[in-house]
Structure formats: structure tokens, C-alpha cells
Swiss-Prot record:
It comes from Azorhizobium caulinodans (strain ATCC 43989 / DSM 5975 / JCM 20966 / LMG 6465 / NBRC 14845 / NCIMB 13405 / ORS 571). Pfam families: Aconitase_C (PF00694). It catalyses: (2R,3S)-3-isopropylmalate = (2S)-2-isopropylmalate. CDD domains: IPMI_Swivel (cd01577). Its EC number is 4.2.1.33. Heterodimer of LeuC and LeuD. This is 3-isopropylmalate dehydratase small subunit. Catalyzes the isomerization between 2-isopropylmalate and 3-isopropylmalate, via the formation of 2-isopropylmaleate. PANTHER family: 3-ISOPROPYLMALATE DEHYDRATASE SMALL SUBUNIT, 3-ISOPROPYLMALATE DEHYDRATASE SMALL SUBUNIT 2-RELATED-RELATED.
Length: 201
């Protein structure tokens, strides 16, 4: 998993509440178990018209936000059915951070497991970040995970909380496999002891 230390980039304002996982990645894209290639399906029902062409009204199709790395979103982001394809699609598109006042629990947990930082902020702070995001490429945000703060284009900062264990995993790029490999020596020792104690196994 790619480390997350400091992220600087354009933030796309998605001023919609209750964005569910079917909106993030519709069900027709769930046939694959690959983590790559899902970026084209991200928000597809809003990004594309019926004929498959881009919907110019959708924020990620607007020139200022096509390379966005951050999404500033309305309340309760990631609600709905459980599907890890949702963070996969965000990551494949290039999104490494989502900021909102609240997230659905399963989506929130899945983000950390896939190298995406979900940040919870107050309503007042979200409104300020929406104002910054509305300025497009003229105003980038900086996410400093070590300092636990969001720095705006005009020097303002928003502090955020994060579980220390999850923070460490993101900073060091540790997913579940990486965490298991960290215990490699202990696992080898345990296996060796078991072979000695119970050679018939």
C-alpha cells in the first residue's frame, strides 16, 4: 500500500449528502475483483450521459477538477451497501482523501485499508473547505497527516482527529498483509516451536 504522508492537490466540491456506494461505483462494475480499472466507473451515473459522453455539469468533468486528489463532500458519505469497490474506484481515479462531516462505518474502515484518508470535520470547517474547493485549480489544499491538519490556500488550517493505529498504518503504508508481514519473525518462531512440540502435525 502506498504511504500517505502529505498530500497537496485540487479538492473537488461534491455538495451532495448521503452519497451511497452505488453512486460511487454502480453495481455493474462489481464483477471484477481487480483493484485497478474501476476509475472509469467512479460516479458513472452522474459523470456520463445516457449516450456515454461526459456530463459537463458533473464536478469531476470540469477542467479545474479533472485531476482532483481530494473530495470535499456532504454528510454521510459512503452509506449504503458494503462494497470495497467504492474505495478501489476512488483510488484508481486518483482520490487519496475524502473530507466530510460524517461517513458510513464500513466505507470509513475500507478507506484506511486501501490507503485513502477519510477526514471528519465540523460543519463550519466543511463550509470553509467548500469555499476553498470552489476556487478550483487556483486554490489547492494540503493534507498533512503527521501534523493532522488541512492547510488551505490562504494559510488557514483545520485540525482533524485520527486513531493513532490507523495513522501509523497510513504513514508507513501498512495494509493487512503488511501488518502480518511485520510479525514474520514471531510467526516463524511459533511455527518452529509447534514442529518441535507436535512433529506429527
Amino acid at each position: 500500500m502506498e504511504k500517505f504522508t502529505t498530500l497537496e492537490g485540487v479538492a473537488a466540491p461534491l455538495k451532495i449528502v448521503n452519497v451511497d456506494t452505488d453512486m460511487i461505483i454502480p453495481k455493474q462494475y462489481l464483477k471484477t475483483i481487480k483493484r485497478t480499472g474501476l476509475g472509469t466507473g467512479l460516479f458513472s451515473e452522474m459523470r456520463y450521459k445516457e449516450d456515454g459522453s461526459d456530463n459537463p455539469d458533473f464536478v469531476l468533468n470540469q477542467p479545474a477538477y479533472r485531476n482532483a486528489k481530494i473530495i470535499v463532500a456532504g454528510d454521510n458519505f459512503g452509506c449504503g451497501s458494503s462494497r470495497e469497490h467504492a474505495p478501489w474506484a476512488l483510488l484508481d481515479f486518483g482520490i487519496r482523501c475524502v473530507i466530510s462531516t460524517s461517513f458510513a462505518d464500513i466505507f470509513y474502515n475500507n478507506c484506511f485499508k486501501n490507503g485513502i484518508l477519510p477526514i471528519v470535520v465540523s460543519k463550519d470547517d466543511l463550509d470553509k473547505l467548500f469555499d476553498d474547493a470552489d476556487r478550483g485549480a487556483n486554490a489547492t489544499l494540503t493534507i498533512d497527516l503527521a501534523a493532522q491538519e488541512i492547510r488551505g490556500p490562504d494559510g488557514g488550517t483545520v485540525k482533524f482527529e485520527i486513531d493513532p493505529f490507523r495513522k501509523r498504518c497510513l504513514l508507513e503504508g501498512l495494509d493487512d498483509i503488511g501488518l502480518t508481514l511485520e510479525k514474520g519473525t514471531q510467526i516463524d518462531t511459533y511455527e518452529g516451536e509447534k514442529k518441535t512440540e507436535q512433529p506429527w502435525l
